[in-house]
Amino acid sequence: MRFGLNIDHIVTLREIRKTYEPEILEALFIAKNTHKVDLITIHLREDKRHIQNEDVLRLLEISPLPINIECSINAAITDFLCSLKNKPSKVTIVPENRNEVTTEGGLDCSLKGLGEVIRAYRNKGVEVSLFVDPLKDSLHFAKEHQVKQVEFHTGVYANLHNALYSNANNQIHAISALKDKSPKELKEELHNAFLQLRKMSKEAFFMGITACAGHGLNYSNVKELLKIPSLRELNIGHSVISKAVFVGLEKAILEMAQLIKR
């Protein structure tokens, strides 16, 4: 299983104060020196709430690890990424909403202009991945547009697991739709969410599409996904950076890697 480390929230901390620290390149080399991280993931948002264009340029210039850039189909961002001398190893196209706290679901594959953006990256020799819900229609769209990789949105699975097996439902930001569900209901829905991820990962494999996954994964809920042999990559960020606040980034990375690289 490949481990993609999302370092957006290193930059979130920097941007809150509009200062120079923490330094994103230090995070990059801490990750590299663990010898456990396979790629670095960053999200270049339209609103630039964390990662900035300059961060992209600096990372691509010196990174010893592959860089996966998440982004919307925004024309300015597409033009910027297509113009780069140093190319990312892949671009993952994601949905985006300025009012969201984080990505709320998979990409709508009927989105106008999506096909053109895929072709624009392909013409520049950049691999494209689509961040999608684990649905067959999304896989058929990827196949039709010669996209060889998808990343399944694991938010539904992760939220259900957290509601059932952690104190998430008692926290200030508990998900209201899950608070009133019984443990039996949560367990059944969690099981179905896992089965859907497993089914679509297997479907992707038989279609010649590499299946990755990410969103909301943490040290507790990631373990079950290791039972899906056709999943090839997990992208994890917030949970690792959160733990790093208390134990340091190196240890936080190593603890996650120990779980997903058994």
Model-predicted segments: where are they?
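Catalytic cores of alpha/beta
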Residues: 74-87, 135-146, 211-213, 217-231
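Histidine/lysine/aspartate-rich catalytic loop segments that bind and position anionic ligands
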Residues: 133-193, 200-203
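Conserved N-terminal beta1-alpha1 strand-loop-helix module at the mouth
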Residues: 1-68, 74-86, 144, 165-171
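Hydrophobic faces of well-ordered beta-strands that scaffold small-molecule active sites
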Residues: 3-7, 40-42, 67-69, 89-93, ...
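Glycine-rich phosphate-binding active-site loops on the catalytic face of alpha/beta enzymes
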Residues: 91-100, 149-162, 230-249
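Alpha-helix-loop-beta-strand connector modules within alpha/beta enzyme cores
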Residues: 33, 49-75, 109-129, 174-212, ...
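Active-site mouth loops of central-metabolism enzymes
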Residues: 3-25, 66-73, 100-108, 122-134, ...
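C-terminal helical cap(s) of enzyme catalytic domains, especially alpha/beta-barrels
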Residues: 162-178, 242-262
